[in-house]
């Protein structure tokens, strides 16, 4: 596989076999994240500002506790919750899918397809949030 990728780096298969998540992920201030206990209304503002269709919920050590997505928002609104009185912990998806930065983009695509999601938190070995990856990043990189 890697010989093929090195021989054909210009094609999407070659990029999928060479490009790593860390090469295209969002980092630093571009990562949508809020601490546990944040009001849902504030989490929605963070999600809107960062434009990835999700926000990651972290503890005080930046370990990933869950994720809140556009889909979670639709489900919450169906329950007619008060976005100002509800905390993100009450509506987030726990045990969310994540990906490591050194993983090939092809593996990130596989996870997104399997879980039917469009964005992933990127974590270090101890589940510390270090980035975010959206399907659009993969499209822009020519991987899909």
Language-model region placement:
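Tandem CBS (Bateman) regulatory domains
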Residues: 1-30, 64-118, 125, 129-144
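Oxyanion-binding "anion nests"
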Residues: 23-62
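Short beta->alpha connector loops at strand-helix junctions that form conserved
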Residues: 58, 123-124
């Amino acid at each position: 596989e890697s010989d093929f990728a090195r021989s054909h780096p210009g094609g999407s298969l070659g990029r999928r076999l060479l490009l790593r998540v860390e090469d295209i992920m969002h980092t630093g201030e571009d990562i949508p994240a809020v601490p546990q206990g944040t009001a849902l209304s504030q989490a929605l503002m963070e999600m809107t500002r960062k434009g990835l269709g999700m926000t990651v919920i972290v503890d005080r050590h930046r370990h990933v506790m869950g994720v809140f997505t556009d889909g979670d928002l639709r489900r919450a609104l169906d329950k007619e919750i008060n976005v100002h009185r509800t905390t993100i912990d009450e509506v987030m998806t726990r045990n969310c899918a994540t990906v490591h930065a050194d993983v090939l983009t092809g593996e990130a695509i596989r996870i997104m397809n399997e879980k039917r999601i469009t964005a992933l938190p990127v974590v270090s070995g101890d589940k510390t949030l270090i980035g975010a990856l959206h399907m659009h990043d993969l499209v822009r990189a020519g991987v899909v």
